[in-house]
Design a protein with these regions (language model features):
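Short, charged recognition helix plus adjacent turn
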Residues: 8, 33, 40, 62-71
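The alpha-helix within a helix-turn-helix
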Residues: 10, 21, 51
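Short, basic-rich loop-to-helix N-cap that marks the start of a DNA-contacting helix
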Residues: 38-49
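Hydrophobic micro-packing sites on short alpha-helices
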Residues: 47-51, 61-62
Length: 71
């Protein structure tokens, strides 16, 4: 399963959802969907903007863990 750790990186960088959404040109609602792991996909361009703003790597935000999301 894919795990989204965006909330962890945002907390480490002390960035609010609203601030990050504005800085990466997303609506707060869409960023919230990504943050909670409910997004079905993410564009590389969006991931790139988030990584740039949070000064991190994609693997800091998204990781793969063994197991099925539906277990």
């Amino acid at each position: 399963m894919i795990v989204v750790n965006l909330d962890v990186m945002m907390a480490k960088r002390k960035v609010s959802l609203t601030d990050l959404a504005e800085r990466v040109d997303l609506t707060p609602a869409n960023l919230s969907i990504l943050k909670t792991g409910k997004a079905r996909a993410v564009r590389f361009s969006t991931l790139e903007r988030i990584c740039k703003e949070l000064d991190c790597q994609p693997a800091d935000i998204i990781e793969y863990k063994e197991g099925d999301v539906y277990e």
